[in-house]
Amino acid sequence: MADHADATKKDGRIPSPLHSLASSTASLGRSPPPALKMASSPDPRSHRGSFAEQMRGTPSSPRASRQPSLTQSALQELLNNPPTKGGDAKFQSRDWSSVRLGELVDPSLVRFVEYDTSVEDATSILVQHGAPNVILLRDTKDTRYATGTFDYSDLNAYLLLVVGLAHPDEEDVASFDELAKKGREGKPIPLRDVKEVGNKKEPLITLPHTADLTKAIEVFGSGVHRVLVAEEGTTDVIGVLTQLQLVKFFWENRQSFPDVDQLYPRLIKDLAIGSKTVLAINGDKPLASALELMNNEGVSSLPVLDAQNNVIGNISHVDVRLLTKSTSLPLLRSSCIHFISVILSERGMNDGKDSFPVFHVNPYSTLAHTVAKLVATRSHRMWVVDSPSPSSSGPPTPALQPASLVPPSPITPLPATHIGPTPVNSTSPTHLAGTGAVAPAISASAISGASLSGRLSGVISLTDVLNLFAKASGLHPHDPDEARRARRRSSSSSMRRSMDSARSESVSAIAGRRGSVNEREKNVQGLGIARGRGNA
């Protein structure tokens, strides 16, 4: 669920997840033993009850009389200030600004492919290896200079293309139609072809491995959601540092960094961080609408709401990995609520996790509570929901401004017929034209979302957290809200839907339309960075 669940790692080669996209489509009871008949049985009326009979009246559970191990105040303190692992000893007694980027990245997590790699093979690598959930593109195998990326947003856009829900500009219609036809026929599509029809992406930001964290936190606090780390004096990439990694680093080593640690006990409402402009989707809407919405608006996750705008779940672009089999395509017609149940089922079977991830906080949540949830769920954002005052004896809860649910761009109805010619081979996937039954799901109107969470009132992203950390440390990151406003302004003149995939986290928490990255490029100028070509 979230920008949030890593793909399961497996040893050895496994079939590509997109390979199947090109293929067709009471427990037992125990009976009591028979009663023994004795020659001289006493009168049943004078029979003394057996031990078993006397125990038929189930005694009360010991838990009913057991004293709680934690008082209410102690439990609240635990929620407000969750414990951490204690941090890495090598960072103790160090100023975080002296930590080098090379100390935080793992070269073994860098995955390269070339532009002639098929989308199918790239997807297989992406799903198998998990974090940092991105594949770097290079021109040849003998270089480690990255010129592009492929991530789950690209995969989402590709699937929408194949099923006929991508709508390019007029000059790209022919290219999109040809790619969609190849995808439905099971023909390999190189990443180079996907790159040709895509928009310009968030610029690739490259920092030397000797750069300190002040440089990275300024970039992240301005809205960029990942940076590449290269060997000093070269373009050879040795690591990828993400917003989530940096937030996790500060959280686990909080005791070592007092200027950041003093922020954790404060309440969200007092810090005044986040945005009240949120893009969301109703739980009764089809999953295809949610995926198209994320693609059109350039966001990586959406809150799923009931009829009263209460948060009842979360859908992330990473969850699109569950749709890479042709047998999963009917899910596109199912409701978002049903897809959430599929996500939870997959977590239980593959990850062995029975917990229900919680992606919301309230204005009275501490920053520590919020960051702990972001790290635990590996999410890029937490939805803020209305909540009553934490103490009935305190002042009444102030009127909380509800979230501004921005109307999204029009969603294309699911196609009723095949787009393009009928696939030429017998293993071609069944298109969405089929009228196969969709698994029934409970309606959003029947769910009491208020008891699950609360009414959506805003969102807090990793960008907001890192921007706060940067300011508290005396740095001057650019205001991510300005990039959000610029994005909304540019969207009014552009409704283009395309393969724009490496989007900025500074705009992923709000509902602005996808626009130019020129404003974000200005934001990172002067920070001593190197840029690569960001198209992929």
Swiss-Prot record:
Cross-referenced PROSITE patterns: CBS (PS51371)
A GO MF label: protein serine/threonine phosphatase inhibitor activity
Coiled coil regions in record: none
Alphabetical list of Pfam families matching this protein: CBS (PF00571)
Composition-biased stretches (Basic and acidic residues): 1-13
Keyword Cytoplasm applies: yes
Localization: Cytoplasm; Nucleus
Annotated region (Disordered), positions in chain: 1-71, 473-536
GO biological process: cellular response to glucose starvation; regulation of mitotic metaphase/anaphase transition
GO terms under cellular component: cytoplasm; nucleus
Biased composition (Polar residues): 57-71
Main location per the UniProt record: cytoplasm
Keyword line: CBS domain, Cytoplasm, Nucleus, Repeat
Family: Belongs to the SDS23 family.
Known role: Involved in DNA replication and cell separation.
Name of the protein in its database record: Protein SDS23
Species for this entry: Phaeosphaeria nodorum (strain SN15 / ATCC MYA-4574 / FGSC 10173) (Glume blotch fungus)
Lineage, uppermost ranks: Eukaryota, Fungi, Dikarya, Ascomycota, Pezizomycotina
Gene: SDS23
